[in-house]
């Protein structure tokens, strides 16, 4: 089972009040519902989902809210994965239910935004977001993918209203248009965690946080290791260059041409190629020299070697 499926399963098990129930149903019916008319039978509402837990949730909420007869149908998809499609069918009072949920207006006109009557308080707003995620939400597994939560809406008006509602809770949701509809998405890990908590997926939120913290720790360690490796490579590269320059001077003009303080450091550097500058400074017989002092003397040796290579006089470098 995917992480998103586990989140949805948890959401379908949340106990809610009657007011929250209608808000959640409003999102499910608006986003997953289809309306049809038939001669002699009036309006029929079908709410479809490929998730059995969500189908049971829709069925039980409709029964509890409106006490109408419902049909539960199971169809097989003919394309791709050929999953089961569960359809909760409402034949009785479908028009009244849709009007009560703020989806159907006067004269059977569709209301594509979110009715204010559904979002009277924070608990109902949270319930609507829960229903929206159950209907069209997806969430990447934080352990194996980048952080990404999204909710699909068919209509731009609903997507805009959903984004506005989401951002009332400071979740920094963004919107984008796709070929078949509109997407609301959240990419910040902290905001995704806040969304899960907001809609009531507490256990999933804690799991998400565990993975996120561990992932962030690993990334921090990797950055630290990479930084230390880069510094080590830089140090090793500098040491190799210094030794090469000292050996070049020894072969060409001899180390005796160097001032005593530079000659001493040159001999120590060649003899102890794997030690740090600080350790090298502690080996000076006349008394310890700071890391910056050792570095200064080695740079002078590098300058002298460069002048010899270029056929220049050493005078300015001594």
Swiss-Prot record:
- In the record, what terms sit under GO molecular function? DNA binding
Which residues fall under the DNA-binding region feature? Answer: 276-310
Instruction: Give yes or no: UniProt keyword Metal-binding.
Output: no
Q: Which domain of life is it from?
A: Bacteria
Q: Which UniProt keywords apply?
A: Cell cycle, Cell division, DNA-binding
The similarity annotation says:
Belongs to the WhiA family.
- Protein name as annotated: Probable cell division protein WhiA
